[in-house]
């Protein structure tokens, strides 16, 4: 309820209920629904660190971050074309390509994916092909980094997340991710075992890295508690070796399924390898980029009804960025 709003000759009475219809009556056009506005208000009061996206964020820098990422996506595309390496837009970047023909308006990174054999070939040439201002961040190039996938970081920028902000000796520049989809078993039981060992090895590495506890929920709480107690006895090099072995366990086997062993969708399990065997090109921010020909099946597997827009109250960046500095890229143009 409101005390009083004056608008021209009309005055809203004290105590009158403020509604979307009343706002429109006085000539104002709401940018979001009243319901979304209330949800955002409640979430803001409960979680003041969350950023909700309408047009821009990061102090007006999100659009510029996306433009910078686009420039280096074009570099990846150039390298992959030169060496005939097959790759696809991935995750939210793929969803943005299909639904928005560009970045999702509230997305703050870019992702590409490859099959393992293409990923390994890409890693052999990427450092010599990329401009000098790009750092290839893998455990082999930076001692403090323990991600199972590759991050390409832009030098002389800052884009530190709530997690990586605790490791300021690491490169924390603007980043985009390069991930491999590895093979998994043909049978449900082998897929489940593969998934379990991958999750355990990744949990050990991540929680040793962040000095945090392994969550004991889920389907295997006893195993999680045991592993949490012994993880301190496992040297990090051995934990990373075990993680790599888990990811590539089926690499030289003839299987028909893949899984997202490196990424966020590990728990979704296996999907048919055939979905990533053919490529088509779609518009993305005015350029053509490759996506899986079976993108509909792949995106449905990831997101369900992926063309359905999420509520405004849920539109927020996927990373909790705590430090942002575009450096010399503040005026970047492709």
Label the model's feature ranges:
Residues 16-17, 31, 113, 290:
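Short aromatic/basic micro-patch
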Residues 21-22, 50-60:
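Short glycine/proline-rich turn/loop motifs
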Residues 57-83, 126-186, 203-302, 309-334:
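Conserved catalytic core of two-metal-ion nucleotidyltransferases
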Residues 77-110, 119-120, 274, 301-302:
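Active-site nucleotide-donor binding segment shared across nucleotidyl transfer reactions
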Residues 122-124:
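Conserved SAM-binding loop
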């Amino acid at each position: 309820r409101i005390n009083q709003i004056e608008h021209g000759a009309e005055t809203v009475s004290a105590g009158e209920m403020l509604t979307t219809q009343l706002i429109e009556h006085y000539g104002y056009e709401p940018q979001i629904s009243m319901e979304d506005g209330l949800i955002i208000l409640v979430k803001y009061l409960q979680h003041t660190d969350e950023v909700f996206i309408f047009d821009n964020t990061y102090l007006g820098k999100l659009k510029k971050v996306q433009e910078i990422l686009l420039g280096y996506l074009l570099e990846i595309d150039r390298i992959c074309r030169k060496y005939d390496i097959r790759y696809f837009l991935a995750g939210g970047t793929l969803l943005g390509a299909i639904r928005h023909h560009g970045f999702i308006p509230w997305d703050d990174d870019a992702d590409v994916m490859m099959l393992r054999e293409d990923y390994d070939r890409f890693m052999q040439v990427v450092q010599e092909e990329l401009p000098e201002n790009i750092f290839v961040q893998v455990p082999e190039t930076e001692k403090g980094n323990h991600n199972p996938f590759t991050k390409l970081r832009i030098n002389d920028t800052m884009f530190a997340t709530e997690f990586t902000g605790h490791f300021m000796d690491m490169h924390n520049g603007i980043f985009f991710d390069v991930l491999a989809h590895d093979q998994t078993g043909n049978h449900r039981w082998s897929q489940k075992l593969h998934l379990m060992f991958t999750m355990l090895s990744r949990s050990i590495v991540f929680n040793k890295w962040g000095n945090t506890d392994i969550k004991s929920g889920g389907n295997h709480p006893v195993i999680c508690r045991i592993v949490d107690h012994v993880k301190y006895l496992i040297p990090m090099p051995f934990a990373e070796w075990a993680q790599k072995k888990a990811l590539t366990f089926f690499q030289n086997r003839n299987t028909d399924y893949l899984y997202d062993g490196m990424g966020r969708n590990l728990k979704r399990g296996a999907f048919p390898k055939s979905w990533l065997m053919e490529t088509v090109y779609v518009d993305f921010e005015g350029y053509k980029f490759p996506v899986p020909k079976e993108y509909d099946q792949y995106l449905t597997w990831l997101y369900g009804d992926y063309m359905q827009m999420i509520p405004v109250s849920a539109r927020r960046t996927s990373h909790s960025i705590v430090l942002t500095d575009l450096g010399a890229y503040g005026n970047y143009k492709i």
